[in-house]
Swiss-Prot record:
Compartments (UniProt record): Endoplasmic reticulum membrane
PANTHER family documented for this protein: STEROL DESATURASE (PTHR11863)
Organism field: Dictyostelium discoideum (Social amoeba)
Keywords from the named record: Endoplasmic reticulum, Iron, Lipid biosynthesis, Lipid metabolism, Membrane, NAD, Oxidoreductase, Steroid biosynthesis, Steroid metabolism, Sterol biosynthesis, Sterol metabolism, Transmembrane, Transmembrane helix
Protein family per UniProt: Belongs to the sterol desaturase family.
Free-text domain note: The histidine box domains may contain the active site and/or be involved in metal ion binding.
Catalytic activity: 4,4-dimethyl-5alpha-cholest-7-en-3beta-ol + 6 Fe(II)-[cytochrome b5] + 3 O2 + 5 H(+) = 4alpha-carboxy-4beta-methyl-5alpha-cholest-7-ene-3beta-ol + 6 Fe(III)-[cytochrome b5] + 4 H2O
Short motif (Histidine box-1): ranges: 132-136
Name of the protein in question: Putative methylsterol monooxygenase DDB_G0270946
Length: 267
């Protein structure tokens, strides 16, 4: 079972923790990790915009986002991250420590880490579905969620382009899973990395053959969420497609569009 353990990483992880200090890593280290993951996931999609070969994988072929709108979006996202997300991490630091989150906790086994990631995706998706659906009603949409829909044809960095209150509301769903299943910072950072890739990818505007959408059943991905931005309603879940199917909120023409695309590919 040693092969299913992360013990081989522990010495390097604990040296890293000793060097920077647990106090720094829990708050500021997590923020830095967030920034590295977020922009690290976005940059490949940004590069793809400059390579003609990838143009055929764009979902909304007729819509372009100019540099002015992308720059404005990037500035607003960074301001939200620095002025909202970082203070949130600092404010909740005592609560995080109170529940026992530690950078020095033993690392989980690989199976338990995978279980935590899958469970966190399911929990976050369920929370996001209902919170997101609620944000499409009345004053919640008019004064809060409408900001996120400024871009009908999204690109990766728009994932966190949102009203500050929405950032707080939807951010809660991201941390529930890892806090329920683990108390170690390593797992939280791994989850943060995969979750940020998921949200950046589903806002990327690209449907590549190697995208999770085409590999994992019930995975929504960019085509699923891009449709939501295009028509402003339906397809509310963040990661999977089954909740929208169960509760009857799948986009009316989404699946007919997917079926048509599959037929065109087979011809």
């Amino acid at each position: 079972m040693e092969s299913l353990s992360l013990k081989f990483i522990e010495p390097y992880w604990f040296k890293f923790v000793d060097y920077y200090g647990e106090e720094f890593l829990l708050t500021y280290g997590t923020f830095i990790a967030h920034q590295v993951f977020y922009f690290g996931c976005f940059i490949p999609f940004l590069i793809a915009d400059f390579i003609p070969f990838f143009r055929k994988y764009k979902i909304q072929q007729t819509k372009e986002n100019d540099w002015k709108s992308q720059t404005y979006c990037a500035i607003k996202v960074i301001l939200t991250q620095v002025l909202i997300q970082l203070p949130m991490m600092y404010i909740f630091d005592p609560a995080i420590k109170a529940i026992g989150l530690s950078a020095r906790a033993p690392l989980p086994s690989i199976p338990y880490l995978l279980l935590t990631l899958v469970s966190s995706f399911i929990i976050e998706d369920f929370y996001f579905y209902w919170a997101h659906r609620a944000l499409h009603h009345g004053i919640w949409y008019k004064y809060i969620h409408k900001v996120h829909h400024d871009y009908a044809s999204p690109f990766g960095i728009t994932a966190e382009y949102a009203h500050p209150l929405e950032t707080i509301i939807l951010g809660v769903g991201t941390v529930i899973g890892p806090f329920l299943f683990s108390r170690d910072l390593f797992t939280l950072w791994v989850w943060l990395g995969v979750r940020l890739y998921q949200t950046v990818e589903c806002h990327s505007g690209y449907d590549f053959p190697w995208s999770f959408t085409n590999l994992i059943p019930f995975w929504g991905g960019a085509p699923f969420h891009d449709y939501h931005h295009e028509v402003f309603i339906g397809n509310y879940a963040s990661t999977f497609t089954y909740l929208d199917k169960i509760f009857g909120t799948s986009g009316k023409s989404y699946y007919s569009r997917i079926e048509k695309k599959s037929i065109n590919k087979s011809e």
